[in-house]
């Protein structure tokens, strides 16, 4: 079992990083429960945390407040720890409509979801890694506090296979079905197995390329091989292999029987209560739905929406804490909360929203009351999982300030870049003044971010700037994640010179080409102009040596004063450090493709694209066969998904490649 973290980097800790690393490591080793890393934008907080993880050498959970940020962190940690298990655990839904009921219109909305198979694979990879090794970093979104199956049950259901082990072939098949693998001799994919005489091939739920081939001689396993699922190429011999369940909600047969009895008892009690209240329609609805689920569980071992019965399946008492990803970690793991000023309030709010929706379903006979126990953790339950935690933020929130009176500061940037100079200018004539500033930046091939207070103002300003010939675009909340990434990329490439937005110019928008951030109506106190929002927005100009911030305001508010003073304090520290060490600030030179790559989580290998024709002449015979096999598989997948244009494109290319070969 591998159990040491190996940090791979061309950089050494610089500036404030060595001091911050030492303080955090010392705090963890001394058993300090809560610590906060107050890290200014661009000071290399991820690199600092990577060094801390390496030094304390504990399994680590990193929680981010959205999938995009989690994907960015996943990519960065994967680069720093290429020889360790860096995993990704976010919600596997591309689209999710939870079941709900609107009593006013008597409308029941069925659960509707589209599951991303790649992310499901990564979730299984994350949980199995925790049972197999200690050098694990899991980057997760807040979905990690939602219910998952029992870790003990999951561990007990792992199928351990060894060479020379005595087991009947049919018994192995039964055990695979018990852990929710499906037999499919034709469409072999993740979470399935196929049988060919004395050979059983298993496609683990945590993989997408390699499968396990188990060869029998009588009632004994003669050989275990790892095989390329696409080409059939043998990759190696194995003495032992562990097959993890294909679902996190797996239950042994005897537990399932007990759970079914308990569900039936609860159903009878609930039906009696509903009938006594005169809710006959609700009682009929509940009985019909629950009995159908019970029949499915008896016959198949699972049903649609089985997570709503998770309390019974794990034999937990009513109201008890559900199992989550946090229970899969050992007791002394390290937790890191990224952008904690946003993530902590998000964790706090999850429980109430979930309960409000489910209570309506219970009241109107769509679910049993036990469905309320399939829920995210309450905040106090989440706190019980904290052993060592590091909050990471440029602007720590009240919770972090309360629990960590002493901050670990990281103000100095390794690049020598300073926090930007801030000017306050009057609101009267702000647009004309702004246009003059934009023109100066365009001449120097630099970019500008403008933040407004309302959607209408953003749209009007964008239209006005377009009319006078400025290349401008508008970023708003309705733009999808990938479109947003494209817009940021186009800004960096110079297709746009100005980006206008409302609350979108804060966390995670690191664009070195931006030399000016303009904050309109800076003196309007509120969420968008609070001290934290202002400091985060100011930080967007800290990646450029010419960084400036202009606040348009008629008076200096308390929030403005705090933000200006904090920025000034940091800048003075940075200037003193640069002077002492003879450092000249230089704008970060960040490759433009990094912006895109960092946000496509878990894409270790570039997807095969039709436009990028493989050069067959430069390939070996084996490589050529693999490319052709992959294309055939892609063509069939496209046809199955009714994407016939893509399938035809692949077919034509395939014929061309085969004729060349």
Curated annotation (Swiss-Prot):
UniProt-annotated location(s): Cytoplasm
Helicase ATP-binding domain sequence ranges: 26-413
Residues in UVR domain copies: 625-660
SUPFAM superfamilies (UniProt xref): C-terminal UvrC-binding domain of UvrB (SSF46600), P-loop containing nucleoside triphosphate hydrolases (SSF52540)
Assigned keywords, A-Z: ATP-binding, Cytoplasm, DNA damage, DNA excision, DNA repair, Excision nuclease, Nucleotide-binding, SOS response
Database matches in Pfam families: Helicase_C, ResIII, UVR, UvrB, UvrB_inter
A single cellular component GO annotation: cytoplasm
Chief location of this protein within or outside the cell: cytoplasm
GO molecular function annotations of the record: ATP binding; ATP hydrolysis activity; DNA binding; excinuclease ABC activity
InterPro entries (alphabetical): Helicase/UvrB_N, Helicase_ATP-bd, Helicase_C-like, P-loop_NTPase, UVR_dom, UVR_dom_sf, UvrB, UvrB_inter
Binding-site list for ATP: 39-46
Helicase C-terminal domain: residues covered: 430-596
Motif stretch (Beta-hairpin): 92-115
One of the GO biological process terms: nucleotide-excision repair
SMART domains, sorted: DEXDc, HELICc
HAMAP family: UvrB
Function per UniProt: The UvrABC repair system catalyzes the recognition and processing of DNA lesions. A damage recognition complex composed of 2 UvrA and 2 UvrB subunits scans DNA for abnormalities. Upon binding of the UvrA(2)B(2) complex to a putative damaged site, the DNA wraps around one UvrB monomer. DNA wrap is dependent on ATP binding by UvrB and probably causes local melting of the DNA helix, facilitating insertion of UvrB beta-hairpin between the DNA strands. Then UvrB probes one DNA strand for the presence of a lesion.
Subunit structure, interactors included: Forms a heterotetramer with UvrA during the search for lesions. Interacts with UvrC in an incision complex.
Comment field on protein domains: The beta-hairpin motif is involved in DNA binding.
Record family assignment: Belongs to the UvrB family.
Identification of the protein by name: UvrABC system protein B
């Amino acid at each position: 079992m591998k159990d040491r973290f190996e940090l791979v980097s061309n950089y050494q800790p610089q500036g404030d990083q060595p001091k911050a690393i030492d303080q955090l490591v010392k705090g963890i080793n001394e058993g300090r429960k809560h610590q906060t890393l107050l890290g200014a934008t661009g000071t290399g907080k991820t690199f600092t945390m990577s060094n801390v993880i390496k030094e304390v050498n504990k399994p680590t959970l990193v929680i981010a407040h959205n999938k995009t940020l989690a994907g960015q962190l996943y990519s960065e940690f994967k680069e720093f720890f290429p020889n360790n298990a860096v995993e990704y655990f976010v919600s596997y839904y591309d689209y999710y409509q939870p079941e709900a009921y609107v009593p006013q219109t008597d409308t029941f909305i069925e659960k509707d979801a589209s599951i991303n198979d790649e992310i499901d694979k990564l979730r299984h990879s994350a949980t199995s890694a925790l049972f197999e090794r200690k050098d694990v970093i899991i980057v997760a979104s807040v979905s990690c506090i939602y219910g998952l199956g029992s870790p003990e049950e999951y561990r007990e259901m792992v199928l351990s296979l060894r060479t020379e082990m005595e087991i009947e072939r049919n018994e192995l098949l039964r055990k695979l079905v018990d852990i929710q693998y499906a037999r499919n001799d034709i469409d072999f994919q993740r979470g399935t197995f196929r049988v060919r005489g004395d050979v059983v091939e298993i496609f683990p739920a945590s993989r997408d390329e390699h499968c396990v081939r188990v060869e029998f001689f009588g009632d004994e396993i003669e050989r275990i091989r790892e095989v390329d699922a696409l080409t059939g190429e043998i990759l190696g011999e194995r003495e032992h292999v562990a097959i993890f369940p294909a679902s996190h909600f797996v239950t042994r047969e005897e537990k399932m029987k007990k759970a079914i009895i308990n569900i039936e008892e609860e159903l009878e009690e609930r039906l009696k209560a509903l009938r006594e209240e005169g809710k006959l329609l609700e009682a009929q609805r509940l009985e019909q739905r629950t009995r159908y689920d019970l029949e499915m569980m008896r016959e198949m071992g699972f049903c649609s929406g089985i997570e709503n019965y998770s309390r019974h399946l794990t034999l937990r008492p009513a109201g008890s804490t559900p199992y989550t990803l946090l229970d899969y970690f050992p007791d002394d793991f390290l937790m890191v909360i990224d952008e904690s000023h946003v993530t902590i309030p998000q964790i706090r709010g999850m429980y109430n929203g979930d309960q409000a929706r489910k209570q309506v379903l219970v009241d109107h006979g769509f679910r049993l009351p036990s469905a309320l126990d399939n829920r995210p953790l309450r905040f106090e339950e989440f706190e019980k999982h904290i052993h060592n935690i590091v909050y990471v933020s440029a602007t720590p929130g009240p919770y972090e300030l309360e629990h960590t009176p002493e901050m670990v500061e990281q103000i100095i940037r390794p690049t020598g870049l300073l926090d930007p100079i801030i000017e306050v200018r009057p609101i009267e004539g702000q647009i004309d003044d702004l246009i003059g500033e934009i023109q100066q930046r365009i001449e120097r091939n630099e970019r500008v971010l403008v933040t407004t207070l309302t959607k209408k103002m953003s749209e009007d300003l964008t239209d006005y700037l377009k009319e006078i010939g400025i290349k401008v675009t508008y970023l708003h909340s309705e733009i999808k994640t990938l479109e947003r990434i494209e817009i940021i990329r186009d800004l960096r490439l110079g297709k746009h010179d100005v980006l206008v937005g409302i609350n979108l110019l804060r966390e995670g928008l690191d664009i070195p080409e931006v030399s000016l951030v303009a904050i309109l109506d800076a003196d309007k106190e509120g969420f968008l102009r609070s001290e934290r929002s202002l400091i985060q927005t100011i930080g967007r100009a800290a990646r450029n040596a010419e960084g400036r911030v202009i606040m348009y305001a008629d008076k200096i508010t308390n929030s403005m004063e705090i933000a200006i003073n904090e920025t000034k304090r940091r800048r003075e520290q940075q200037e003193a450090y640069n002077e002492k060490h003879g450092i000249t600030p230089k704008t970060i030179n960040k490759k433009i493709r990094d912006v895109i790559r960092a946000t496509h989580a878990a894409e270790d290998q570039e997807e095969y694209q039709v436009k990028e024709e493989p050069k067959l002449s430069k390939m070996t015979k084996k490589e050529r066969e693999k490319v052709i096999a992959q294309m055939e598989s892609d063509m069939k997948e496209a046809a199955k998904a009714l994407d016939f244009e893509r399938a035809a494109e692949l077919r034509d290319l395939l014929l061309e490649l085969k004729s060349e070969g």
